[in-house]
Amino acid sequence: MTNVVVVGSQWGDEGKGKIVDWLSERADIVVRFQGGHNAGHTLVIDGTSYKLSLLPSGVVRPGKMAVIGNGVVVDPHALIAEIEKLSAQGVTITPDNLRIADNATLILSLHRELDAMREDAASNSGTKIGTTRRGIGPAYEDKVGRRAIRVMDLADLDSLPGKVDRILTHHNALRRGLGVAEVSHQTIMDELTSVAERVLPFRDTVWLFLDKERRKGARILFEGAQGSLLDIDHGTYPFVTSSNTVAGQAAAGSGMGPGSLGYILGITKAYTTRVGEGPFPTELTDEIGQFLGEKGHEFGTVTGRKRRCGWFDAALVRQSVATNGITGIALTKLDVLDGLEELKICVGYMLDGEQIDHLPASQGAQARVEPIYVTLEGWKESTVGARSWADLPAQAIKYVRQVEELIGAPVALLSTSPERDDTILVTDPFED
């Protein structure tokens, strides 16, 4: 028996929600360890769709404990709204099935406002990142700057005013520079005190809770948000998110030691998508790209933004296998490729006349790379709902094997539709 860390191996939107839900039946605890409510996923259970963006996937399954770790930035208003929305769908959420790290950073209204102001200014200069404008980045900045308001601070009204003064000293200086009205001390105090009673019942010393449960033999599933190529260090900087999204963050963002993380499962889409700005070597702007977007329903769960689509990039996923220490992958949306006469897989790049096997870190070099492809024959038969290798066309199996060989990691799970049971299990990560 082992614990499992689930990470996206591309630019997010790989189908982590379904896989995490599928694995959560085998887990006792599901932990979010980074990001905020900027990355959403949809779970389909018995025909009912649940849209989550902050809460761990395990929260919709009875008998599971959901944990929001210290690596997550928590918007208390978004948290309350998501709890209320799920409650209206019949999901019970109490401290018996949800814990929030007392040292997790809070997202405030001033973070959202700063995020939007920066994006607007960057749009005018052509340098926008394409954030969700939800305050994620500014909240992480305050965390690193040691001026953040944390969950535990809601319980200490004696020291809270001084902490509000500290964060406002920074933000009001920024707002003056941007020509925007300053935020009053009372506005932030009112904002925090209005949510305290709703948030504080869920707070816990998460690292201690997880350590005790681990020692009792609990199976723990760590749920990553976004994808490895959006990692603040290892992604396509500066077009990245504001946190570490690789598997190592599961330890830092939960307080559990890295030796206890276990199996690293990389969720990998059978083609490539990206939301927002940034390099995308295999992007298709032709009818095939449109086909992938329409058939794959490539629109963001949180923002509704249309995703850019392209061929599978084995060079990029190979990079993610290395930076995450991926044990095996879950290959998703294979069924979207049904009907294409031929398929291409990127195996490397040409850069200034030289062949390279990885995407360079330099923004300028990333813009100049040209993908090198291998071409495979497609298949006409449907793979939708396949639950065994015998259900797959020969060419689909060949495609999967080619992916495994090129990225240097085996397929542990294969997903053939949004339905959780339409999954081919090769290796159970919890039993590895």
Swiss-Prot record:
Keywords: Cytoplasm, GTP-binding, Ligase, Magnesium, Metal-binding, Nucleotide-binding, Purine biosynthesis. GO terms for molecular function: adenylosuccinate synthase activity; GTP binding; magnesium ion binding. GO terms for biological process: 'de novo' AMP biosynthetic process; IMP metabolic process. Its EC number is 6.3.4.4. GTP binds at residues 12-18, 40-42, 307, 333-335, 415-417. SUPFAM superfamilies: P-loop containing nucleoside triphosphate hydrolases. Substrate binds at T301, V302, T303, G304, R305, K306, R307. The keyword Cytoplasm applies. Binds 1 Mg(2+) ion per subunit. The keyword Transferase does not apply. Signal peptide: none annotated. Mg(2+) binds at D13, G40. GO terms for cellular component: cytoplasm. The active site is at D13 (proton acceptor), H41 (proton donor). It is an enzyme of class 6 (ligase). IMP binds at D13, E14, G15, K16, N38, A39, G40, H41, T132, R146, Q226, T241, R305. Pathway: Purine metabolism; AMP biosynthesis via de novo pathway; AMP from IMP: step 1/2. CDD domains: AdSS (cd03108). It is found in: Cytoplasm. Its cofactor is Mg(2+). Homodimer. Belongs to the adenylosuccinate synthetase family. This is Adenylosuccinate synthetase.
